[in-house]
Amino acid sequence: MELLVDIFGYLSIILHGITIVAQSMTLGGILFLVFLVRPFMHLLPQGAELERRIAKLTIWSAIGLILAEVAGVGLQVAVVKSTVDLSFLDVMQAPFAIAGTIKILCALLLIPCLSQRMSTGLVGAALPLLIGAAELTAATFTTHAFARLDNNVLLLFVEGLHQFGAAIWIGAIPCFVLALSKLHDANAWRIVGARFSRMSMIGVASIIISGSVMCVYYIGDIPGFYGTAYGVMVGAKIAMFLALLLLGLGNLMVTERLRKNQDTSVIRLRRFAEVEIGIGFTIFFAAASLTSVPPAVDLTADRVTLHEIAVRNAPAWPRLTSPDHDQLAISEMQAQLDKDAGLRHQAAGQAIVPGSGVLPPRNADDIAWSEYNHHWAGIFVMVIGLLALLNRAGVGWLKHWPLLFLLMAGFLLVRSDPEVWPMGQEGFWVAWRDVEVAQHRFFVALIILFGVFEWAVRTGRLRSPKAALVFPLLVSVGGAMLLTHSHQISNVKDQLLIELTHTPLALAGVASGWARWLELRLPGRGGRIAGWVWPCCFMLVGVILLWYREA
């Protein structure tokens, strides 16, 4: 069990992200039902059916929340029990376990409350809201605010306001998309669009106010933004939040046109809302990643300066030649262990045990090896983006460009982790205990999947419109997961300088995925523009990778 603590730590971030998504959808569904569907149900031609569908979606979100919380709390309990000599009952008295248990109970209570038998009357409205408020309160006790010694009450309230804003806006968008798809009347679209716009404005205001307060108390100053991992991740959240505001503004304009002209198409409203869901959920995973790092105000030492950022990112020619595998630090350490064991006529031990928590040694050749990998990956992505642009421009025979993803995946599988099979001594399966190896393999699997699907779609082997959506979805997932990617480097500054490169990579990946989604789903000029945007985002990813430095 001790050898799995690192991988469990990473899985806990992923589970926390899923928990935030499920919680926001659950609370958003309650608010959408209580403040939009039920008050206007008599004005909507399919009001009763819409209420049933929204309630069903909210119930499934609550079930997802239960499963995510059970898995998350169970994982944390297992890790604590394996590292500290405490009984199960003792661990379950910890604040995270109590808060998780309350959230599970609240989600369980919501399921019968959202059934049709309890959907009418004052009780049908008040009870889900009260249970949702209890759920939200418990959720705030798993945030940084609970651990603060100063301004604890204020920050707990602010955290609650922040999560409320995310729920009433982002968490309710799936309900909004469902409503638009089930309603077929222009007047109904106008009512739902106008009401949800007001709900979204409340959410935006809540997020801006609470986010501003948290920036003051958790980041403190401008150097905290660019000089700490917490500040960099908050910056990524702000960038995606601004993208959501632009999409929301576009939808508000459609809603206003719909109010003046009932013949206005709502297709853009639906497609932009779909992208808002994707970017919003990515923000939730960034928020989950924030829980694994201390607030910037607590990290006064080892901050990265602007000078260090400028030096690290100074222009330099890409590294196109690789050092020998035998020159890497782990290879040299293993060779020395083998030599010493041979002199003693004993079996040699492993230089590094996967999952042991011991950070691997690094030397200049390790840095060169990593830079070589990133730079050649950048060349792959640059070429892919260029070929996709040329194919978009009408060069039909370039439709096979997605096959380059398979070459890139093979390159990364072999080179990303030199201490692991096939180049190193660590076995293929045992290396899964290493969190960085597991993340690299996950990305390789994603690259293979979206490469195969996109090639099959472009060559006509897969003709289903749903198959075409696999590529943008997986690209977006890859970008979101890159926000949670970690490196096993002991030097805090070096780790942050690497993260400063990976964060824009993630944002460009998310942008490219959802731009491709719009190309496929949005008819007319908007879709055509998106078709040119996403290959450019790929080329931007390539440029960033070619710019990558570790020293």
Where are these predicted regions, by residue range?
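Membrane-helix interface and helix-disruption motif detector
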Residues: F225-G227, I367-E371, A393-L398, M423-F442, ...
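A motif-centric signal for short, conserved binding hotspots located
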Residues: V475-S486, G509-A515
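Polytopic transmembrane helical bundles with strong interfacial aromatic enrichment
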Residues: M1-A368, L390-W401, G451, W455-G460, ...
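Alpha-helical transmembrane segments and their helix-helix packing motifs
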Residues: P112, L407-V420, W432, G460, ...
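Helix-loop junctions on the outward
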Residues: A71-S87, V414-V435
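Short, solvent-exposed interaction modules
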Residues: G427-A456, L505-W514, L518
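Structural signature of hydrophobic alpha-helical transmembrane segments
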Residues: F96-I104, P128, Y372-I379, Q439-A445, ...
